[in-house]
Amino acid sequence: KLDACEESADDLMLKEDSAAYAWSGKRVSYEEFCEITENNEDRYEYIDGEIYLLAAPGVSHQMFLANLYTLFNNWFMGKPCRVFFSPFDVTLANDALKSKNVVEPDLLVSCDYLTQRNENDRYTGIPALVVEILSPGTRGKDQLKKLNVYLNGGVREYWIVDPRDRKVMLYYFADQQLEDMDLFRDPAVVKSIHFPGLEVSTTDIFAD
């Protein structure tokens, strides 16, 4: 008799959501994080030993991401580097904890994607440029925690796109030090330092 095992779709969804949120905020080792997220459809980040559950992005976030991908992809077409967008895991060294950080940038540019892949076709390299689009739930993490993650992890350039204030903050790193930074308020043209010639209008980024 199977009556005791019958559950509604809503009950199953509630249990899955509860399990997903149960891990958020937990401090675990990198190995434990890999075990938790293996074959797990929920999206997580792992920063400084702590697990972060990634919520589904909103409409505006995805519109601006699509705009950025189109602008970046058009510029990088025919060049040796490629543009990727989330969901796309990036694992970076965390020397302070002698461990690793695992993040999902909204958009990234990789110049080592051909050689830095494991047997499961997972990316193992270091992006040259990373873009994060702020949302209400990620403002603090993207502007503080991820800034340090990318700086210490070997990323060369980090763009923070702020739809609320219609601005883009650009950070340029060299030898794991902040080399330069700039702020572009709409309307403006964001000019990459690491990729000379890559110029993106904020009007095009925030177009709806």
Where are these regions (language model features)?
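Gly/Pro/Ser/Thr-rich low-complexity, intrinsically disordered segments predominantly at protein N-termini
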Residues: 1-208
